[in-house]
């Protein structure tokens, strides 16, 4: 766990609002030192959804966030030590992406793909490229500095994509230094119930 985390904000569409509020109640019992807040963006369809980045902006606005933030997709299961990710951010003081070296370029087509220099700075970043330039895949986990948060509104105001969260750092690295933390371990995108149950069995959790 990252001891510096004192608030957890979860944003959802209206359909799953009650489910997440129930989860937050249980989570608060396990982590009483952390304040949990669920935000219902009020949307009910693909036509009205805000998109991942639109939802992040929704929380920034409504929660009046003014702090460094860790943003991650709730459907990603990772086995690495999150503390190391945060320590890297503290050490360098730059916006930080979570990355992993994949085995093949074909696998990378499902992710944002980064080119890094020897110090881990992002030199190129593209969301789900048809022709990946490296095997460094960027996962949906980011630590952004407090002074980076207002830039998301600028990004959206320019008419850029509000959907996949990887689009924002692809815009951001061209304007300020962005680094990547390359982790060792596994991250699984839980896109189906079968994948969820598989992960539960492998890591001795109770499947549903």
Describe each PLM feature range.
Residues 115-121:
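Short acidic-glycine loop/turn motifs at beta-strand connectors
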Residues 80-109:
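Conserved donor-nucleotide/metal-binding helix-loop-beta segment in metal-dependent transferases, i.e.
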Residues 77, 86-90, 121-208:
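Catalytic-core segments of class I nucleotidyltransferases/pyrophosphorylases
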Residues 11, 39-41, 99, 128, ...:
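Conserved beta-strand termini and adjacent loop/short-helix elements that scaffold enzyme active sites
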Residues 42-48, 105-106, 131, 187-189:
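A short acidic, often aromatic-flanked loop/helix-cap motif at beta-alpha or helix-coil junctions
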Residues 35, 113-115, 179:
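Short, surface-exposed charged micro-motifs
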Residues 1-72, 77, 82:
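Conserved N-terminal catalytic core of the sugar/cofactor nucleotidyltransferase
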Residues 48-57, 111-115, 140, 194-198:
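Short, surface-exposed amphipathic charged segments that create phosphate/polyanion-binding patches used
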